A protein has these predicted regions:
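N-terminal juxtadomain amphipathic helix
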Residues: 64-66
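Exposed, interaction-prone extracellular/peripheral surfaces
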Residues: 2-41, 57-62, 71, 80-85, ...
Length: 273
């Protein structure tokens, strides 16, 4: 016995999410420098930045190169102007934790896979000095967990993410809200920040295409499709089913008729543009 409780395959904890940062820390892209996460060229930061930060009177020990000649001439006393690099690498992340995401036949639930994908991406953004916003959709509501501007503040948010996941895991709601309804909140958040959505694409809703088109006109939007191997390639055989509206029965699936959910999802997004 080691004294450490092992997290089950269908559960998560804060320590597990913290360890995901190691995947980013070991990434060679981080060593290449702190450039934009989506850039193809990387370079280390140099200089003092170009965004004005403040203007103040000269103090002993200040670098003479920071003198602001205009303010000095206008006031008659030496003044220095400080600069910094604008931190505008903000990303808004959406985690689909509706009831259908609590399903899985290999390794873990789709909900856990969605959380893992978003947390890894969020750690990467923070390592590049960006800010991350986390929005979570459940059967009851869609809400903004908050914005994190540092690794410390993001670590505090992980506790709430774990609590929301566990609450949903212990509920047995049968009906998913439409995805387009759950996504409505993100249109009002984050200004022009890119949006990354981890979802199983269940119950998208009739207005989903229109919503995505509207968002894509103003900001970058990326989908991470979370699917289970059983969805992509179920073994041939008879399968019982029971729908939320009370229908039940059996269906026979042939191997060549396997659900190609990834292809359907990709094709639909391409048609949206």
């Amino acid at each position: 016995m080691t004294g450490h409780a092992k997290t089950s395959a269908v559960d998560i904890d804060v320590d597990m999410l913290m360890r995901l940062r190691l995947l980013c820390a070991n990434n060679y892209l981080k060593r290449a420098g702190a450039a934009l996460p989506t850039a193809s060229l990387f370079s280390r930061k140099r200089g003092r930045g170009i965004e004005p930060h403040d203007v103040r009177p000269w103090l002993d020990g200040d670098d003479v190169r920071t003198l602001d000649h205009n303010v000095t001439a206008r006031t008659g006393t030496p003044h220095v102007r400080n600069f910094h690099e604008e931190n505008s690498h903000n990303t808004l992340y959406f985690i689909d934790l509706r009831p259908s995401m609590y399903f899985g036949t290999r390794r873990t639930f789709r909900a856990v896979a969605a959380i893992e994908a978003i947390i890894i991406a969020a750690w990467r953004t923070l390592d590049f000095n960006g800010s991350v916003g986390i929005v979570i959709a459940t059967s009851q509501e869609t809400r903004l967990i908050g914005w994190a501007h540092s690794r410390r503040s993001f670590s505090a948010m992980l506790h709430e993410i774990v609590a929301i996941y566990r609450e949903g895991k212990n509920k047995f709601d049968a009906v998913d809200p439409y995805l387009c309804q759950s996504l409505t909140l993100i249109e009002k958040l984050g200004g022009s920040a890119p949006i990354i959505i981890a979802t199983g694409f269940d119950q998208p809703g009739d207005n989903f295409d229109m919503f995505v088109k509207r968002i894509a006109k103003r900001r970058e939007i990326t989908f991470i499709l979370i699917s289970d191997p059983f969805e992509r390639a179920p073994p041939s055989g008879n399968y019982p089913y029971h729908t939320p509206d009370g229908l039940a029965g059996q269906i026979f699936i042939k191997r060549e008729e396997n659900n190609k959910k990834n292809d359907i999802f990709s094709m639909r997004l391409r048609q949206i543009g």
